[in-house]
């Protein structure tokens, strides 16, 4: 058994803004099945639906005010909640204020999370002591710096969910963040004259993981490394990719309370009809394509706007759920007003996302980059074939309907490359051809629903990594 302190800025079902929370929330259960014991340290945000707990650490002054770490159990998760009201008990989002601007003290807020994690690793939480610390993204990146300051040799593993966010702040905050100025150099946490929490984590980690093997390789290139490609090439021997899994109990077409449950391809028909009615779409001869996404250029929404005429002209439909860039929201809504087979709902609705997975024929993920992606895994589970860009985890989890894959009866979706509107338009054309061939389409849906999209394989790899890395 390896005892692991997992450190993250969010964790489902407590608090969530994206897929990071789902992974952090699912990992403890997956690892428990293999005998490992995870406790998850997260900030105590104002919106968090848990109170109380046993105090296992206390700070008189944690970057501007008193704080405690409280141990409790919630929905099967062993949690350590960092209660620091001056940093986390405020209205607005986890990372941004009510006006969409980053909180000006984000550096201090997540330095506090890392500092508390190092303290728990060094001093323990009651009679519990971690063998390894597993941090997620830049918000946990300063953990190895604080471990070094405490003289603690507990190994640190960093998982990169999205390298686009570095957690950089000005060098004038060295003292305020209680960092060793002698380590402010290119070999530690200095990055172009700034303090970089992500670089600190990358340089201080015993092992680095990211959420797919293709993304691990992409990260070492200037195109995808977001400025950290040189650091990652330097640490390439410590870098590996482990694809995320999904919660097979939450995402289960046989038991999902949000849908008409089904076990085979034929069961999707009732859900498709219900989804068309919910979106105000009539019955159509072509495939119903669904998109559940943030509406940003990174997610390829501009490409969709330029290419979806192909599927609409061939009798298909597109249903969109998401929010994001105002200009893209407006473009989609205006197109929907003019296109009877395009329907758009701005916002996010978890229950509706389940109904879209059950009722769609195809799930669209045209992202310009996608470290892992969970949406395509939900689609596979529900027999909603993914149409995806050839990047990151999308490349690793979808078997393209190439002639060879179709001949071998292993195809589970459609990939397109390069990531352009023209290539996406061609992919829509291929989609319509495949959908018209009912025998081939049915075989692909059956293949998709048999794919191992849970945590078993990924958990086995983390189990081996924890065991190899843990303090002996």
Curated annotation (Swiss-Prot):
Highest taxon of source: Bacteria
Pathway noted in the entry: Glycan biosynthesis; glycogen biosynthesis
InterPro entries in the record: Glyco_trans_1 (IPR001296), GS/SS (IPR011835), Starch_synth_cat_dom (IPR013534)
Catalytic activity, reaction form: [(1->4)-alpha-D-glucosyl](n) + ADP-alpha-D-glucose = [(1->4)-alpha-D-glucosyl](n+1) + ADP + H(+)
Gene3D superfamilies: Glycogen Phosphorylase B (3.40.50.2000)
An MF annotation (GO) of this entry: alpha-1,4-glucan glucosyltransferase (ADP-glucose donor) activity
Residues given in the record as ADP-alpha-D-glucose binding sites: 16
EC number(s) on file: 2.4.1.21
Entry keyword set: Glycogen biosynthesis, Glycosyltransferase, Transferase
A GO BP entry: glycogen biosynthetic process
Protein role: Synthesizes alpha-1,4-glucan chains using ADP-glucose.
PANTHER family, alphabetized: ALPHA AMYLASE DOMAIN-CONTAINING PROTEIN, GRANULE-BOUND STARCH SYNTHASE 1, CHLOROPLASTIC/AMYLOPLASTIC
Family named by the database record: Belongs to the glycosyltransferase 1 family. Bacterial/plant glycogen synthase subfamily.
This protein's name: Glycogen synthase
Source organism of this protein record: Jannaschia sp. (strain CCS1)
Organism taxonomic ancestry: Bacteria, Pseudomonadati, Pseudomonadota, Alphaproteobacteria, Rhodobacterales
